[in-house]
């Protein structure tokens, strides 16, 4: 052990032990109306009483009216999201760890603290993906609550917008694509909706990943199967994406040869891919992976002969002409039923004919072997179940580190170690903030992969609540995290903010097509349903076949009748995934969901033109726009100017800005309001998160 390594190891060990000793000694202080105080962890509200856990582990119940107003307000908030004693203690620990390395990086401390106006705009954009309304901005600016920042963070994390904005991130990460471009008429809407539902329920991330890796059936029977069906026919590409998203390892190079810059060999690639070797991704009744040998089962997850029996029934009872153009919808329906995931032990991963790596020879059968860490326990379970258990096990810190690092990147605009899809162990050891990286990895495990609670910790740090660093850090050097990096809005944030300006905060509650009809039609139990019952599903399928299928939802629960929902006035997360080419979302960089994390933040001429004279900008700042109409509630020109600034930039205007804006309104009336709104929307300040 050299002298340089030893202090780092000592510091990292100190970090790990620091996480253990966060106890009630860091608990919130609660104050009674007569001035007495106590330290305790809040457990919940029971009628007119508050329940607490004391230092000795005992729990007590105290009437709520015994506490000062600020504590009563805090209790109401914590009852919804949980006590924040550990949250704040963890946030303080992160700040301490970061601060310890700031001086080494040449900084005396964090960037300047974020003022209230920049804070409120940042947390709205970062947590729920849109700017605040002027009413939301003023409510925060005028609040005298001592815990107003913590309260706002919690309120936003509990709002529908949190899941909406988080969905946009994972849609990019997991390349969520609902279109029928995969196979004739086959869609992924139930899988996309599954992601929305999991995030709304705040499902632990490790459980979601386990569901995706072990799912069987089609997307109607089990929507999580969409993860593996996403790359049907490109199984090794699917495995490479698994490595990037869940392990932070890009091993795709090793499919053809030993990795030129890392330790992975061609044999490692196929050994790890072998965990998915028994996985049959099927189209109709044929395995999609031609490169994998073995026999096909006639209809995945169905009794022997089911497909032929149903087709014979359709021919005899309904005059269907199989594989004829006139009955193509019947063929599409059967194909969609059979587009599913099954475990087939006769399938194996075989080394390619030109295999040149060590550990085997061409056409050998690859045997499952993990890339890193402990071996997976294969006995008594499917290979996919084994790799899911290995991946999410607490003994595999890599999984926790990868998602913690990604969530950190969301908050700060830069990961602790990167890039997020591919970093070696040496990069972890050489990270600029190694103690913080180790600590947040442990925190992700401590909160049991509760992403909402993890983000709650990050948003409460002094580091996050600092002025953004304007100069983009060089990827070739370590960033010290003296504050978040100045970022441009994602395409979805810009879209949702503009929808807010046009329609108001009602957009937070509106939902679009949810895949419920498509899910119901394909949710066929081959073992129990009669041919007549399955035919009813096909009759329903025909009602919404073609382009209407993507917008079809169940008219009522329990029915098989479709109704079509409009995609007007919806947030980006509720639109078709991905949205149409040449739309504003596409113009501002929304991913086409082909490559992992392919969102584009670069500016472009079409973006400038869209903001300067596009149809959306006209609707937002024109004389009949909501922005101009809302200013009618203000009397004087100076109040109208403030109102426009509150609405678009969420801050008070400077003295010079107020004077200039007042002159515009005095000279041109509503045209002046419209021109001011147009100017603010086209300023860099509107699109950037400071």
Residue ranges and their predicted role:
Residues 11-21:
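Bacterial N-terminal signal peptides
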Residues 86-88, 370-376, 562-580:
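An acidic intrinsically disordered interaction segment
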Residues 92-122, 126, 130-161, 175-530, ...:
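Primarily short, surface-exposed interaction patches in extracytoplasmic proteins
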Residues 164:
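Metal- or metallocofactor-binding catalytic centers and their adjacent structured scaffolds
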Residues 25-96, 102:
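Compositionally biased alpha-helical segments
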Residues 2-13:
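Bacterial N-terminal signal peptides that target proteins for export
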Residues 499-575, 583-589, 594-605, 609-612:
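Long, His/Glu/Asp-enriched segments that create or flank divalent metal/ion-associated functional microenvironments
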Residues 170, 676:
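Globin-like tetrapyrrole-binding proteins
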């Amino acid at each position: 052990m050299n002298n340089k390594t030893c202090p780092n190891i000592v510091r990292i060990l100190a970090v790990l032990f620091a996480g253990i000793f966060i106890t009630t000694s860091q608990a919130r202080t609660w104050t009674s109306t007569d001035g007495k105080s106590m330290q305790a962890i809040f457990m919940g509200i029971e009628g007119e009483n508050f329940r607490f856990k004391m230092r000795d582990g005992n729990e007590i119940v105290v009437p709520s009216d015994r506490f000062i107003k600020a504590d009563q307000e805090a209790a109401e908030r914590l009852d919804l999201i949980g006590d924040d004693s550990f949250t704040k203690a963890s946030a303080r620990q992160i700040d301490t760890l970061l601060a310890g390395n700031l001086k080494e990086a040449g900084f005396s401390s964090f960037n300047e603290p974020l003022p209230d106006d920049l804070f409120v705009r940042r947390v709205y954009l970062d947590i729920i993906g849109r700017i605040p309304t002027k009413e939301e901005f003023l409510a925060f600016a005028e609040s005298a609550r001592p815990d107003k920042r913590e309260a706002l963070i919690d309120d936003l994390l509990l709002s529908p917008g949190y899941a909406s904005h988080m969905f946009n991130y994972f849609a990019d990460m997991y390349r969520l694509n609902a279109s029928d471009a995969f196979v004739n008429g086959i869609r992924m809407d139930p899988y996309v909706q599954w992601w929305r539902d999991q995030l709304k329920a705040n499902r632990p991330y490790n459980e979601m990943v386990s569901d995706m890796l072990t799912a069987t059936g089609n997307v109607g029977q089990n929507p999580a199967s969409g993860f593996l069906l996403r790359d049907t026919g490109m199984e090794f590409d699917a495995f490479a994406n698994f490595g990037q998203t869940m392990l932070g390892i890009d091993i795709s190079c090793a499919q053809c040869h030993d990795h030129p810059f890392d330790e992975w060999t061609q044999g490692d690639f196929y050994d790890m891919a072998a965990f998915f070797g028994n996985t049959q991704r099927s189209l109709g009744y044929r395995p999609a992976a031609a490169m994998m040998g073995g026999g096909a089962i006639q209809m995945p997850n169905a009794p022997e002969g089911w497909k032929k029996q149903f087709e014979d029934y359709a021919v005899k009872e309904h005059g269907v002409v199989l594989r004829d153009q006139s009955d193509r919808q019947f063929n599409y329906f059967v194909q969609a039923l059979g587009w599913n995931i099954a475990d087939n032990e006769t399938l194996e991963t075989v080394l390619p004919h030109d295999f040149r790596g060590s550990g085997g020879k061409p056409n050998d059968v690859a045997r499952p072997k993990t890339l890193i860490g402990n071996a997976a326990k294969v006995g008594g379970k499917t290979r996919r179940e084994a790799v899911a258990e290995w991946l999410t096990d607490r003994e595999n810190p890599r999984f926790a580190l990868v998602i913690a690092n990604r969530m950190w990147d969301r908050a700060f605009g830069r990961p602790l170690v990167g890039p997020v899809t591919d970093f070696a162990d040496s990069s972890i050891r050489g990270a600029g903030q190694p103690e913080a990286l180790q600590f947040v990895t442990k925190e992700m495990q401590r909160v049991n992969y509760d992403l909402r609670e993890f983000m709650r910790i990050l948003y409460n740090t002094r580091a996050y609540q600092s002025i953004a660093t304007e100069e983009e850090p060089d990827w070739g050097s370590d960033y010290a995290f003296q504050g978040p990096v100045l970022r441009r809005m994602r395409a979805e944030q810009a879209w949702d903010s503009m929808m807010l300006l046009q329609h108001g905060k009602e957009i937070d509650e509106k939902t679009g097509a949810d895949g419920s009809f498509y899910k119901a039609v394909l949710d066929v139990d081959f073992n129990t349903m009669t041919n007549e019952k399955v035919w009813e599903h096909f009759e329903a399928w025909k009602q919404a076949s073609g382009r209407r299928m993507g917008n079809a939802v169940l008219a009522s629960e329990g029915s098989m009748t479709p109704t079509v929902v409009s995609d007007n006035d919806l947030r980006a997360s509720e639109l078709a995934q991905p949205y149409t080419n040449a739309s504003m979302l596409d113009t501002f960089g929304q991913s086409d969901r082909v490559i992992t994390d392919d969102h584009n933040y670069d500016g472009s001429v079409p973006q400038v033109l869209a903001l300067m004279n596009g149809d959306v900008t006209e609707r937002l700042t024109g004389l009949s726009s909501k922005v101009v109409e809302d200013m009618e509630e203000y009397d004087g020109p100076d109040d109208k100017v403030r109102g426009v600034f509150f609405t678009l930039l969420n801050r008070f205007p400077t003295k010079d800005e107020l004077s200039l804006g007042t002159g515009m309104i005095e000279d041109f009336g509503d045209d002046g309001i419209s021109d001011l709104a147009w100017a603010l929307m086209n300023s860099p300040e509107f699109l950037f998160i400071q």
